[in-house]
Amino acid sequence: MECIGKRVKSRSWQRLQAVNKRKKMETVAPVTSPPKKRRQKKPKNYDSDIEDITPTCNDSVPPPQVSNMYSVPNNSVKESFSRIMRDLNVEKKSGPSSSRLTDGSEQNPCLKERSFRVSDLGVEKKCSPEITDLDVGIPVPRFSKLKDVSEQKNTCLMQKSSPEIADLDLVISVPSSSVLKDVSEEIRFLKDKCSPEIRGLVLEKSVPGEIEILSDSESETEARRRASAKKKLFEESSRIVESISDGEDSSSETDEEEEENQDSEDNNTKDNVTVESLSSEDPSSSSSSSSSSSSSSSSSSSDDESYVKEVVGDNRDDDDLRKASSPIKRVSLVERKALVRYKRSGSSLTKPRERDNKIQKLNHREEEKKERQREVVRVVTKQPSNVVYTCAHCGKENTGNPESHSSFIRPHSIRDEIEDVNNFASTNVSKYEDSVSINSGKTTGAPSRPEVENPETGKELNTPEKPSISRPEIFTTEKAIDVQVPEEPSRPEIYSSEKAKEVQAPEMPSRPEVFSSEKAKEIQVPEMPSIPEIQNSEKAKEVQANNRMGLTTPAVAEGLNKSVVTNEHIEDDSDSSISSGDGYESDPTLKDKEVKINNHSDWRILNGNNKEVDLFRLLVNSVWEKGQLGEEDEADELVSSAEDQSQEQAREDHRKYDDAGLLIIRPPPLIEKFGVEEPQSPPVVSEIDSEEDRLWEELAFFTKSNDIGGNELFSNVEKNISANETPAAQCKKGKHDLCIDLEVGLKCMHCGFVEREIRSMDVSEWGEKTTRERRKFDRFEEEEGSSFIGKLGFDAPNNSLNEGCVSSEGTVWDKIPGVKSQMYPHQQEGFEFIWKNLAGTIMLNELKDFENSDETGGCIMSHAPGTGKTRLTIIFLQAYLQCFPDCKPVIIAPASLLLTWAEEFKKWNISIPFHNLSSLDFTGKENSAALGLLMQKNATARSNNEIRMVKIYSWIKSKSILGISYNLYEKLAGVKDEDKKTKMVREVKPDKELDDIREILMGRPGLLVLDEAHTPRNQRSCIWKTLSKVETQKRILLSGTPFQNNFLELCNVLGLARPKYLERLTSTLKKSGMTVTKRGKKNLGNEINNRGIEELKAVMLPFVHVHKGSILQSSLPGLRECVVVLNPPELQRRVLESIEVTHNRKTKNVFETEHKLSLVSVHPSLVSRCKISEKERLSIDEALLAQLKKVRLDPNQSVKTRFLMEFVELCEVIKEKVLVFSQYIDPLKLIMKHLVSRFKWNPGEEVLYMHGKLEQKQRQTLINEFNDPKSKAKVFLASTKACSEGISLVGASRVILLDVVWNPAVERQAISRAYRIGQKRIVYTYHLVAKGTPEGPKYCKQAQKDRISELVFACSSRHDKGKEKIAEAVTEDKVLDTMVEHSKLGDMFDNLIVQPKEADLVEGFSILMP
């Protein structure tokens, strides 16, 4: 062993001599380095820096670990090595040794507080696989104040860095511990998922394997390792003895290695490339530093090459290490080669040296510019509003603006987390001692994605693009004064000193800027891995949860003492060519025009400065032109969901390619027909076939009529069939079969009986046409007129004086060519009437003269229900917007009618967008910019006001129409009702959003359309007060029944059309005494007819257009109304009398009593649904209630349900549908049960039920199903309030009204659901009245009100004047006649009154009075 020690000592001495010679030669030509303030040298005991160097050649054996027990088996070797290292340290006085740096740290106490572990930076695993020629020296401060970082977290951080960084010379002042915590567990799963992407790096050499950092935290593990180290030491010593015998060859190799190691040390000294070692307080961190240094300085070679390993001794206990403060490091080999300094041989020795020289030359400014001209680096610059995200797994890019909330999980940010964890760990770094240079290699051309060379195969590897985002840098000075951008973007250098005055920011966009200070103590990582929270001080709390994508913090002032995170965007002033990795080069705006963002549920809308945007406030300001969404914003903010994109792409690929990946080329479809194809007309049914069908229907009806009333009827009828039923027998009964004989007259075909002679008959009765055919012919003449020209879409010449000015050129009709011929005469007249009231004239050249005229204002279109008021209004709006495109029309209607308006716009192919504010669904015609902003939010995060504001904004910014219901308009724009009682006033908190919407809805509409304008007729209601305060005076009121209950309500409706006329109308009513029509007055008097009505008509004439519905009478088959007075059975009469007694006692709640009577008149069992008073219980006892409960499903216990069941059965035979109305829900539910029980029908198929609780879409679905002639629907049960207005139920030809209401307009509206344009059958209506109940007098009052309405609203249409008001009455009703004549059903009927509301029949209503 003494021999071994002598040989080692001699070889070491020779090695030192060679080192000194080389040092003197290289100090002659020093390399210029960045200016740095040298610390004062302080004497130090160099014995504390002694390192044990044990040469070994066995790769499989880990380096020995030095401990207190080391001197037992090998004391001589230890003493030899100690003397050698003491001599070595004496000779190293000329260079900046680690001990000097250690002493320097003592002089600078800030250094110790800022230092942290190398393992926190992740140097080991970040650079281990492919980093070559990195010489690292690590000075160690004695003490560190930052502690308590677990080995697991440090190890995880070291595994996160990119393994493909080549030729990195790193100068970092390393603290002893990191303040970064709780990061490893959140991002450990990313270790093996994706390969990091570093652009512009050329890797030429393989690197050693992974280095595992050992920890001394467990004493048992340390003891085992020390024991194994002792054993292996002797084995290595024996190998050394054998290697000595090899002679001078091995000596020469050792000399070369010594020279090379000395060169690397000198280079590190000259280039100021050092890495400070860890403090002894953290053994794991110390191991991490040593392994990182060795790994970065190692280079690859062949398997058969020999290696000389420099193994550093093990550290001791923590207390001893604190005293010694020596840079003791301990490494261990794991799976691959140990930490060594590799000997280079052959060609592999030249390239690393050349690279070192190249790095040294880059420190010169002039040479750097030349080098930069040779190597063109593509730098990606992006604005903060268009940030590029790259998936850490697949490399796919996306752009967008994420939110800054701490709970936000940003997609595609995993790679950012991997890189930024290390950067945030540097918040407490003291200073950068030297520069960091990255050799990025050369790139050819201008590829959108850089390529990395594979060190093994030499081939180029396509790596995903580095996300081109603005990443802040690390500044760790005491007083950060200035930040400058370097000239060369591809070779960033960072200069730092004890007091840094100038920091040059590197161009690498992947380094976040973190300003830290001495007192920065803790950086906490929240549970969500993508957004680290920073809790450093009270002032730094505002910085928490800031994202890395552009949110800026206040600038760092001089003398900053708190840790602040900033993400300011660094402008790039370099003249390098711009290239974004997604294919857009030299023009970053191209990318901006195709921004696509994932629709994340928690994303917030950010503006160009990456600040959160208040969508509602932005749209409100845009409406009032305080701010505006421009075209650029519209293009930038359009959103395309990632799922939608992937699905669309998958569908597109499926269409283009087959299973084998080949392109599918489909031939174009063959054209079977050429030219313009006309739509197929329905098959023409001959008269013979139609007559045959009619005969079969009559046969079926006769057969079914024999079955009604029970099964015994058919047997009785069969017995009575005999010779008495022959035609002769019928003639004897007076039932003749008449026909027209032109020579005789109207005579019987069988017996020759002449009922009327030919001379007494009118010529019109000779025709062969029936009444229906005659109406069809008249309608054809009226609609088509002269006109073949009308079929071609041109207006037929009209010689009428009244129409002369209309058809002339220069009128509003020219704005809608071809539409006039499609309108009915009353619609054409109404169209011009609206123009004259709102615009003053129909002549285009005179419109400007009436813009501010007092003659213009609102108008009322009082057309009969079903005569096409909606169609007329749509045509007017279409023409009005052509002349006044800045007009903002608003349509206010009941909620159930808004869908009808939308359907009408589609039906007539109107291109004007219609925005339904009462619906939260979008039509696709909204403003793309506003809709794009809203779609960035998840559906659950969108408020109703934001959705409504998008529609309002779309309505304001384009030529469109806004629709809203009365209830919603009252909610959004309503004013507080001060007249109501205190208990009715709701205290509502001030809502800024509602105030903004109210201001828009009250001030911006230029035209107001009120459908069913009789709805807001109460002067004390909130909706009436709100509508009367709308700024615009251009209003159109649509109502088929403007007169509802009294003249006061009529005056309120007229006042909405012309607010200026309200006082005049009120005074007229007071003078004429027409207020007597209020409820409770019995006598109307003749004064109203003679004086008051005429005065009121004179006031209304200029702005009220009336059409009584003559177009319906001339175009539709006909209408037959009948009041059916029924006799209730015994049980029902008993219950009705009990309630009637209470009613006669003048109970206070009259409406509650009327409700009971209406329910019991339908079925007596419904009394259980009502609240029975104590007096009523005297008559309606428990026994009666139990009996009623048993007969609940028996329709024969009520006269109305019995009539309805038999009636529906007969209508089913003749294939006619029945529409049943009631003002209450309970009767309709009971009738549905009766129908289902008797006919075995299914609810929703044969029986449809509509009530007020249904949504608008469900209502429209039921309507369409019932009107479909091919559907199974037989009966439609409807609530009077739910569907008595606006909707079309032309599928029904039989209408039954179960109860009587006070308002005559309600019944008229209900009847008009079936009797309207589009009806193809005669409509029969039945008003069911129970005898002996208050329903008779109520109906009389209703008839009187209807008569007054007829007198007030006289026909004002030119087309109606001179024509008969009432068309030919329909006298035949075979269904009702059959029921009345039936022997078992005749007892139900008490009386029938046909056409009861005619003027000559009003006085005859006394028959209905009890």
Curated annotation (Swiss-Prot):
It is an enzyme of class 3 (hydrolase). GO terms for biological process: gene silencing by siRNA-directed DNA methylation; positive regulation of post-transcriptional gene silencing by RNA. Residues 245-266 have a biased composition (Acidic residues). Keywords: ATP-binding, Coiled coil, DNA-binding, Helicase, Hydrolase, Nucleotide-binding, Nucleus, Repeat. Residues 1-12 have a biased composition (Basic residues). A motif (DEAH box) lies at residues 1011-1014. Residues 1-74, 87-108, 209-330, 344-376, 428-593, 632-654 are annotated as: Disordered. One of its GO terms (cellular component) is nucleus. Residues 306-323, 351-376, 450-463, 488-504 have a biased composition (Basic and acidic residues). A motif (Nuclear localization signal 1) lies at residues 22-29. A motif (Nuclear localization signal 2) lies at residues 328-335. Belongs to the SNF2/RAD54 helicase family. Interacts with NRPD1. This is SNF2 domain-containing protein CLASSY 3. The gene is CLSY3.
